[in-house]
Every structure is written in C-alpha cells, then in structure tokens.
Amino acid sequence: MAMLLPQNPSQVHAAAVNGDKNTLHKLITESALRDSEDQFGRTPLMYCVLADRLDCAEVLLKAGAGINKTDHSQRTALHLAAQKGNVRFMKLLLSRHADWRLKDLEEMTPLHLASRHSSSKPLSLLLKHMAPGEVDTQDRNKQTALHWSAFYNHPEHVKLLIKHDSNIGIPDSEGKIPLHWAAHNKHPNATRTVRCILEAAPTESLLNWQDYEGRTPLHFAVADGNEAVVEVLTSYEGCSVTAYDNLFRTPLHWAALLGHAKIVHLLLERNKSGMIPSDSQGATPLHYGAQSNFADTVAVFLKHHSVRDEPDLEGRTAFMWAAGKGSNDVIKIMLDLKKDIDINMTDKYGGTALHAAALSGHVSTVRLLLEQGGMVDPLDVMKHTPLFRACEMGHRDVILTLIKGGARVDLVDIDGHSALHWAALGGNAEVCEVLMENGISPNLQDQAGRTPLQCAAYAGYINCMALLIQHDADPNIQDKEGRTALHWSCNNGYLDAVKLLLGCGAFPNHMEHTEERYTPLDYALLGEHQELTQFLLEHGALSIAAIQDIAASSIQALYKGYKVRRAFRERKKLLMRHEQLRKDAAKKREEERRREAEQQLSFAEAGQKQRVLLAAVGVEKLSLDEAEQRVKDSVAAKGHKHKKSSSAHNSQSRREKPSRAERRTREPETSDAPSIRSLPPVTPMSTKKCPVTREEVCVRETFGPDTGISLNCGSANERRSPAGSSRPGSAKPVHTGTHVAPGHMETTPTPKPRPSTTGAHSKNASQDTPQHNETQTTSKGNKPISEHKPTGSQPSNNTSVTRQKEKRQEKETHREKDKRSRTEGDKQTVREKQKGTGIERAKERLMGRTRKKLAEKEKEKKKDGTCSKNQAAVVIQRAWRRSCVRGRIRKVLCRSLKGVESAEATALLIQLLWEWPVLHDHTHRKPSDVQAPPTRIAGKKSSVLQNIYGAAPSKRGTSLRAAALKTQSQSQSQVLLDLSLRTHKQLSAVECVNLVDSVSQAKQFSYHLRPSSGASQSSQN
C-alpha cells in the first residue's frame, strides 16, 4: 500500500485548495490519498472547507473521504465550517451525518464555535439537529454556548439559545454566569444582551450573583465604566449597590478607584441604605478617590450629603491619603469644599498629613500643607517629625523645604536617634551633608550608644562613612555593648569599609562589653570572611583568645611578685606575733607570782584572826557523838516538817551524810573532851517589832542572855529589798524557832533558865529546833497582812492557824462572788424585763457569760502575776538579810570580842554558824507548802528565781565548800596548823570557814547592794 502512495502527497491538498476537480479525481483514485494528512493533521476535505470549495468537497465525499476525521487539534470539518459560519458546508456535512458532538482539545463542540460567529444561522442550523438538553454542553472552562454568546455580545444568539431552553444560571470555572459576561462588555449595545438575560429571569439572586471572587455583574459593569449597563442593572430593585467582593470592596469603591465620577453619582443616588461602606482596612470610597487624585470624583463624594471624611482603621482620613499620594488637586478641592478639615489631624500613631507627604517625598504637597498652616514639627508616638521621615527615605528637596519652613534638626526620637542617624542608616550622603551643615554633630549617640558612623558601617555605605569621617566623626566610639563601627563592618564583611576605618585611625582591638568579649577580628572569623581576616591580621588585629593569652602571662608575672611580697609579710607578722606571745607569757608569769603572794598574805591574816578568835572565845569542847546526834535531830525535825520538799534538798542532805560519816571515822576520840552538857543552853527567840540580827543572836548564845553587848538596830525596821522602797509592799515573813538563818527572819532573845543537865539541854534543843514558817498573803490592795506570832511550841499550831486563815479567806471570796453574782443577776433581770423578745434575752445571757469568763481569767492572771512578784521579792529580801547578818557577825567577832575563851567553844560556834544555813534553809517555806502539795506557781517561782539568781546557796553549799577545800587546801591547812594539837583533833570533822567567801557568795544574790554604814565600815577594815 505504501507502493501506491504518490511521491508528493501535498498535491492532493493543493488540488483541494485550488478547486482542481480533474487533478483531484486523478489523485483520489487511490484510497490512501483521500484522507491523507499534512503536517497539521488536516485532510483534503478540511482544506476544501477552509477554501470554500464545495464541489471538491462533494467529490471527496463521493469518493469515500472520512467526514469525522480530526486534525491534531481534534477538530473535524464541521468544527471548521461552524467556526467559519459556512452554512452550505454545514448543511452538506450534516446531511452526510457529521457528528456535532465531537469535541476538540478544548472540549468545544461546533455549537460553541457557531456562537462566536456574528450570524445566528449556523447556530440555528446546529440547534435543529440537537436533541433537547444537549444545548448546555460545556467546554473545558465549564462554559456553554450561552456564555460565549453573552461574551461576544450577540443578543440574537442569546435569545435563540434561551428559546431552546438554555440554562442562564450555569456557572463556569470562575463562577460566572452568562450575565457576568454580558455586563463585562464596554460596548454600549451590551445593554441588549443584559436585558435579554434579565427578561428571561429578573430575579434578585441573578442580579447579585457573585463569582468565586465575590464580584457581581455590577462590579464588572463599573470596572468597565459602562454607564448604560450600570444604569440598566441598578434600575432593578433587587440590585445591591453595596455588595462586597472578597476584598471587601463595593462597586462604589471600584468606581472611585477608577475615577468614574458619573457612575459614582449614579451609585450614590441608587444607594438606598444611606451609608457609605468601607473595606477590610476601614477605607471608604472617598479614600480610594483621594489617593488616585480624581478631583471630580472626590468632589462628587464631598457634595453628597451622606459622605463624610471618616478615618480608616489606622486613623487616617482621605485627606491624609491624598497627602501621602501627592494628590494636590484633591487636597485643594477638599480644603475648598470642607472648611472644617483639620490639617494637623493625627492618625492612630500620631502621624499627620505632613508626615505622609514627607515620607512619600512630594515636595509640592509639603509646601502646600505648610502654606495652609500645617505644623512643621509634629511628633508621632515614636517622636518622629516629618524631617525624620524625609531623612529616612533620603528626600533631599523635602528636607530643605522643611528646614526652610522652620523644622528643628536637633530633635531625637524615643530611641535617641537623630535625623542624622536615619539618614546614615539609609546611606544618603547628600542628606547627611545637609544635616551636618545645619549643626548636627556626627558623634551624637543614641540610647544604645551608637553613632551615625556605626549606622552607616552596619550597611557598608562607603560614601556616607567617608563624608562623616570628613566631618570629624570618631571611628573609635564604642556603644554600650562595646562595639565600634569596625565591629559592624567586619560582621557583614565590608572590606572597603574596614580599609576606610583603619586608614582613618580606627583601633582594631576594641573588645565588647559582653561575656564573649569579641574583637573585630572575631567577627570576621565568625563570618568566615577570609580576605577581611587576612587584612586585619596584617594591620595588627588580635582575637580575644590572643588577648587573653597575653593578659594571662602578664597576670602570672604580677601574681608571682604578689606571692613573694605576701610571704614576706606573713613571715614578718609571724615573727612579731612570736615576740608578742613571749612578752605576754612573761607578763602572765609575773602576775601569777604577785597573785600567789597576795593569797599567802591573806591566808596568813585569816589564820591570825582565827587564832585571836580561838583565844578569845572559851567554849567547852563538844564530843563527836553528841555533835552527830544534834545534827541528826535537826535533820529529823527538818524532814518531819518538810515531808513534801523538793528532791534537790533531799539529794543534798544525802550528800552531806556520808561526808559527816567520814569525818566521824577520821575524828580521833580524846578522853578529856568535854561533853555537850557543859555548854550554855540555847535560848528561844520571840518576834518583836525591833528585829535582832544574827550577830546579836550569836553573841547572846555565846555569852548568855545577860550579856551587856548590844548592836545597832536602827535600820532593823527598814525594808531591805534590792528593788528599793518604790516597789509595792509584799507580805512580811514571820519566823519561829530559836536558831536564826541569815536573812530569813528577825528575832529577839527571850531569857530562860539555864538547864543544869545535858539531857534537859538536848530536850530543849530538840523541841526548839528552828521551824521557819512563812505566811504570805495579799489582800485586794496588795497590803501585807498582820504578822502571825507563834507560841514557839510546835509546828502544828502554825499550820492550823494558816489553815484557818485560808478558810476564812476562801469564805470571804465566796461571799464576794455571791454578792457580785446577785448584783449582776439583778441587773440582768432588769435588762430582761426591758427587752421585748426572747432572742435579745438569749443574746444578753450569752454576752454576760462571756464577760464573766473574761473577767475571771483577767483576775486569775493578775493574781498569779502578783503572787509571783511577791514571792520573788521575799526570796530576794531573804538573801539580802542573810548577807547583812553574816557581815555584822564577822564585824562583831572581830571588834567587840576581846575575852579569852577555850578553843573548843570557838570551834563549836564556828561549826554552828557554818552549818546553820545548811540545816535550816529547807525549813523556810510557806505554811501552804507543808499542808498541801506544791502547786504550779511554786514550781514557776523556783524556776524563775533559778533563772535570775542561779542555784540557791543552800543547794550548792556542799559543792562550793568542796571546791574551796580542793583549791585552797594548802592555805586552810596553814591556818589550822596554828591551832593547838588538842583543838586540831577536836575540829578535824569541822569544815574550814572562810567568812570572806561567805560574804562574796551572798553578794551574788543581793545585786551587790549593801547599807551605806556597812559599806563604810568594811572599807575602814
């Protein structure tokens, strides 16, 4: 079959185009040549259609040429005939059963192509051969023949298609219906097509149909500026003038933006809402017209009663938009039509119309605003003036205009930037020169410490940097972080800028003030600028690592010198301290020697005094058994009276017993020792108004009741309290018994017949064992109760009296409480009678109970505080009196006694005086302590006094004497050696007495207060 093909198959196409029937008959004898295709895939039949060779087409069709053959565009001969509008060929092809449903590459049928043609005959011919429903066939863009007819503004085609039931509401791929394409035509006859479509369905949904961008047919009509179509569309009541597209723009916005003044007027008149819409930024159509400099359109807006110059969301008015766009005509129109326009009105950020004009660089607008009275230096929120905006953008003419208008060049913004900073940051060398000529310093720093040179170096503006350096800009100024202009140039790798700075004297090794302490070389290394790094190294630049190495070596050298100097100073201090210690040791040894000499001297004087006492006082020697029996009797009497005493006193008595047993074992028995029967009897004491001190008691016990020795009792009635006489009075202690403990009571001797036998003496002694009973009661006014005078027979009488007194006091208190409760009850009943409701009575009862409880609590607190204060005062008075009695006894024994007595009597007196506080200190208790168990107040009293004064002398007497024996054994032994051998044997069980130590111990509990007379006498001694 290939052998039958001619050498040049294009001859068939040429014969078809030229209409050479004879040649065509000859060539188409071969079947392969009937449908031969050229380079476009077209057959001879297609060329016949294109060349309008109907006879040749008939020849080809009779010869059997393919009628539905397609070219490379998938178009058939019918497509070409419909496109050409050749009705004859269309009839021929349709009569030969050509398929009109075939689509080309754009999915267009011959119907779509026929709708493009101005004649409606090809379209009507095709419609005759179509079945119902096939008229709305869509192409690739989802468009029907009606879309194409409306687009090409063929009203007859539209009517014909609508007559054949074409759907007018089918959207294409852009969401547009045929009405959109009909309105989107600038031809005045487009109104016919629009009317044809609207007459078919004049609905509101069709009028306001929005495509996929939200635009209605009115948007397209306004955009094309077709006033006739706009008038036709707006003539229908359902047409919306304020419909928003996806950009929130209405047809009125598009009319103002494009400057269609007539359409604007028409839309304003057809706007039934009476409100001017705004877009997504709050801009009104007036803003759009003002920025486009359409003075006529703006005039139409301003003349309409519903239009106002409202600001947008940023606070900018249409006047500001016009100034920013340089619309001088609009500015003039607005100033003429709106006399109330404020030229200096500010937006949300404080900007004015002059700011906008200066930023845009419109010199004429700036000049016009200044002529109309605009402020030359208004400040926005960033404290920028119009001059700052012009310098930032580099508008030299605007800057000169503003400076001539009086703009200040010395102002700075909120960050401390001057106009020169902004000009340098923009690289505007000419503007920088103008500003420096007007007095701005090139070394002015902002709040971060940056200069205009650093701003220019940051962007690498060489010309600006050179100009600043020519005007004496310092390249070595550092900002607050330590960076210089060289840092910024190296950071961005500007080699030319680095060369310029180093050539102008910039120091290459400035370090940052941050933790990294980077230098310009470090910035170049971090940015991997190799050429710049090499250049810096050649000019002596160092990195922070190299600088740290150099600094480390210098610091090490300095530290070595410092260590040597410090070692020398420490050695010097050590030698000086050694010398000082040696001097202190020598001084201490000298003081110890002097102290030892003084102690030996004092011990010698004490021994001499004791020898005088032993020689002066003559008392028969006591036997060891009788002395021990006497001590046991006193201890037994003490235990009988104080059964419920504290465990501390019992432990102390137990510690004293073994010591006495040891003395009994060590004491040698002598045959010629006098018995205790030969001693004078101990006379009992009775309390009087004039108290007798311990000195008088001791003297009368030694020399008898008839002795003529008398002591001064002038200050006996005085109240000896460490707190002074200003303290409120407390209960006076009352004591009974014969033996007197120092500072616990004041007694006077009562003469009694001296017994002749030892048994009587021991009996009296056992009966008259000192029982110190203290009765301390406080009345309402803290006045002391009258003293109780005991008979001195037995302790039970005292306790019974105190119990009776306590019972009386309790009865009195109960009576007082009953009286108070009765009076309060009477008052309460009166109040209840006055009150009307039961609720108020219940409230009053509750309040009364709470008041009673509070009053009782306050009374108990006051009573406890008063008792504790009185008890503390009594104990302090006892300690004070004890110290005074001991001092006076010592003075009496040293001064008044001059007789010579036996050493045994002296030893006995010393023993009695020494053991008296130990034996009878536990008996000084309140009667309540004997009759009832101790209360909380007593425990608090002892703990409080122990915290104030330490342990009682009676409790720690044994420990003090043991310490004294241990530390001063040599001195005491030296004193006792001076006694006779017989006396030494009898006194071996008696502890050594040091009256000076006793007085010093007493001083610890009396605040070192002594009577003036006693102090003067002691100083004289």
Curated annotation (Swiss-Prot):
Regions of compositional bias (Polar residues) in chain numbering: 759-781, 791-802
Entry's Gene Ontology BP terms: body morphogenesis; cloaca development; convergent extension involved in gastrulation; establishment of planar polarity; heart looping; kidney development; opsin transport; pronephros formation
GO cellular component terms, A-Z: cilium; cytoplasm; cytoskeleton
Residue ranges of the motif D-box 2: 862-870
Keywords tagged on the record: ANK repeat, Calmodulin-binding, Cytoplasm, Cytoskeleton, Developmental protein, Repeat, Wnt signaling pathway
Composition-biased stretches (Basic and acidic residues): 579-598, 653-669, 803-866
Motif position, D-box 1: 483-491
Location within or outside the cell: Cytoplasm; Cytoplasm, Cytoskeleton
Start-end of Low complexity biased regions: 722-731
Region (Disordered) location: 579-602, 632-691, 704-868
Main location: cytoplasm
Superkingdom of the source species: Eukaryota
Placement of ANK repeats on the sequence: 7-36, 40-69, 73-102, 106-137, 141-170, 174-206, 213-243, 247-276, 281-310, 314-343, 349-378, 382-411, 415-444, 448-477, 481-510, 516-546
Description of its domains: The D-box (destruction box) mediate the interaction with APC proteins, and may act as a recognition signal for degradation via the ubiquitin-proteasome pathway.
Subunit structure: Binds calmodulin via its IQ domains.
Protein name, entry field: Inversin
Native species: Danio rerio
